[in-house]
Each structure stands twice: as C-alpha cells, then as structure tokens.
Regions:
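Short alpha-helical transmembrane segments in multi-pass integral membrane proteins
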Residues: 1-13, 70-137, 168, 183-211
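Residue-level signal for short hydrophobic patches within transmembrane helices
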Residues: 6-25, 29, 51-58, 134, ...
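Transmembrane alpha-helix boundary and packing residues in multipass membrane permease domains
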Residues: 16, 20, 31-32, 68, ...
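Helix-loop interface residues and adjacent transmembrane-helix termini in multi-pass membrane transporters
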Residues: 25-28, 36-39, 73-76, 151-152, ...
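Alpha-helical transmembrane segments of multipass membrane proteins
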Residues: 28-32, 102, 144-148, 167, ...
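Interfacial/gating helices of multi-pass transporter permease domains
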Residues: 34-53, 119-124, 188-193
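Small-residue-rich hydrophobic transmembrane alpha-helices
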Residues: 42-105, 139-158
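Alpha-helical transmembrane segments of multi-pass membrane transporters/permeases
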Residues: 93, 148-175, 189-196
C-alpha cells in the first residue's frame, strides 16, 4: 500500500514540479541567447526580467487560489460549479493583468530611469519591458489554467504545456535574436517577443485541451 501511495504521489507531483518551472525555463533560455550581445544587453535583460516576474507574481497568486478552490469543489463533489470558478477567475485575471500592464507602461519608464545608473542600460531595459509587458496577458491566463488542472490532479498536461513553451521559446529566440532563417535580427527585443509568443502558444494549447 505504501509503495502504491508513494508512486501515486510522485505521478502527480513530478510533472507539477517541472511544469510550474515555466517562467524560469523561459528566462534561462532567453539569457543563453542574449549572453552574446554584450554587457549592456545582459544587464538590461536581467533587470527587465526581474521587473516582469515581480508583476507576474501577482497573477500567480490568483492562480494558486484557483487551484485550491477547484480542488476543494472537486473533492466535495461540487463539480458543476467548477466551470463558474474558472470563468470568473479568468475574467478577474484579465482585469488584473490589464491593470499591471497599465502600471508598467505608465510608470515603468520613470522607475527604470530613476533606478538605473547607466542611461544605455536604462534605455535597453525600457525597450525590453515594452515588449515583454504584453506577455503578462498570456502568462496570466496560462497560469489560471495551470491552477485549474492542478486542482483536478491532472498534472501531466501541465508538463506537456511547459515543454511546448520551452521548445517554442528556444526556436523563436533562435529566429528573432540573431536573425536566423531569413528573420530580421532584433537583438534584445527578440527575447521578449519570443517569450510572449511562446506563452501565448502554451495558453492556447491548454485552452484547446480544455475545450
């Protein structure tokens, strides 16, 4: 019995541990590709990514709430109301990510300039965050669906989604940052573009699977 219990726990948690590592995977792969672009770009990328992740964590908190609520309703046999929970969470998440997006675009530039000692790094960081900010909408909605599937104990699909995001991000980084396969070389701005598109792909994958 113990052996079966441990195996069942591992079957659920192993994909979960890897699947919720999405933002780290995206950031690490971006960092590998931009590492050849110089110190200014590396500094702007690191600080810009930190600013983005700080805002993203607000959205992550709502996704954790969805996970708990869905698991509670599923365990209580109230599955009919789980759909309403998911829908309401997605609407609220849309407003939250929109608010964070507005704050980022209205105050982000002033904050970056005020905190940066180098004007070159500040400008590169501003260019980065203006593109990366759009990813908040996709990443936030993706996390809601991740929380939903975790609450139901269906973690394998989360792992598939994470792998899809990682593969897409690596491929798009290869295309956009250095301008391969006929694409223009976007440099630093290619990284946030690749990340945002990859997060959109991950969200659409889970949405289609849900439907």
């Amino acid at each position: 019995m113990q052996k079966y219990t441990y195996r069942a726990i591992l079957k659920i948690t192993a994909p979960l541990m890897l699947g919720t590592f999405v933002q780290s995977i995206v950031t690490i792969t971006d960092a590998v590709f931009v590492s050849e672009l110089g110190d200014i770009v590396i500094g702007a990328f690191g600080n810009g990514s930190l600013m983005y992740i700080s805002l993203f964590m607000f959205c992550r908190g709502l996704a954790d709430g969805v996970q708990i609520t869905v698991a509670n309703k599923d365990g209580a046999g109230a599955r009919a109301s789980i759909g309403d929970t998911l829908f309401n969470a997605q609407i609220f998440q849309l407003f939250l990510s929109g608010l964070l997006f507005a704050i980022l675009f209205i105050f982000g530039e002033a904050v970056i300039i005020g905190l940066s000692e180098s004007s070159d790094v500040a400008q590169a960081m501003i260019d980065f965050i203006k593109v990366r900010g759009w990813g908040l909408f996709f990443a936030a909605q993706h996390m809601i669906l991740v929380g939903f599937f975790i609450g139901l104990g269906r973690t394998n699909i989360i792992l598939v989604s994470a792998l899809l995001i990682a593969v897409c991000n690596i491929f798009l980084d290869y295309l956009f940052i250095h301008g391969n396969m006929g694409m223009p070389a976007l440099g630093l701005q290619g990284a946030p573009l690749a990340s945002s598109i990859s997060e959109l792909v991950g969200f659409l994958f889970l949405l289609i699977y849900l439907i």
